[in-house]
Amino acid sequence: GKPDGAVVQFGGQTAIKLTEALMKMGVPILGTSAENVDKAEDRELFDEILEECEIPRPTGGTVFTAEEAKEVANRLGYPVLVRPSYVLGGQGMQIAINDNDIDEFIGIINRIAQDHPILVDKYLQGKEIEVDAVCDGEDILIPGIMEHIERAGIHSGDSISVYPAQSLTQKAKDKIAEYTRRLAKSLHVIGLINIQFIVCGEDDVYVIEVNPRSSRTVPYISKVTGIPIVPLASKVIIGNKIKELGYTPGLQPEADYVAVKMPVFSFEKIRGADISLGPEMKSTGECLGIAKTFDEALYKAFLGAGIKLPKFKKHDHDCP
């Protein structure tokens, strides 16, 4: 028999890429439509949406050759982020600091993804923030705001993530919630959306990426907020409304504890692996530390990841 429809938003980027093939086979796509998924993935369409929503993004351009890439990079000023469009796990994404880097990176990218445009963006120094939200076409539910501890540009699967975000001003949080609402409405999201932001200074908020699907942070944010995001999104996809399901739309109140997600790596098992972190994902697992304070949650997360930290107290008389 023919399926009533397919849900592509729970299978990561791989499932999103099957959307077109499924539609050609006559399978209806449930949840966010294929056309709106495209708007989030296609650079030019997405730029139009950001403009409509009045949301800033790092300046950049779309190129096809190394020459064009160098032109854009020199116009923006180094460092820049270079990446192929439509990628999974940040594959082929690099931070370039000069023209030589660009020649090298474009050579590598063209080996893995021909005929795809390449994005060159200004690399912003700032805090990387991530949000997963559920939208029913009218209302948006944001379980919480997560903050990555490392510099921006480390792949989100490899970064240490903290909920609730520790260093954001109320104004920045309000902007993040408002931008999430605008984007979800503008992309006509039915189900899940994942958005990554960079916050520079006190409260300059830029959008760096939107995924109209479930992301790897969904299990983490569900666990630490107690909101069952996947069952909720599944019900929304088949037509239920957030309010009917007993939830208050908007950014939910922050928990009174701290949860730290820690990536787990297998470098000791993989000989010759490059252990420096960047925009390409290298972790093979993750674990979670929950406590009343950030320090203790971080300590528990390190223990969970198998990293033994030295225990000592610093006394005043120890200092020279």
Task: Show which residues each predicted segment covers.
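A short, GP-enriched loop/loop-strand-helix hinge that lies immediately N-terminal to
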Residues: 1-41, 56-61
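ATP-dependent carboxylate activation and anion-phosphoryl transfer catalytic cores
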Residues: 1-3, 13-16, 27, 31, ...
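Short beta-strand segments at enzyme active-site cores
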Residues: 8, 83, 194
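Small/polar loops that bind or transfer phosphate-bearing groups
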Residues: 10, 38, 64, 97, ...
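A conserved helix-loop-beta module that forms one wall/lid of the active-site cleft
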Residues: 32-93
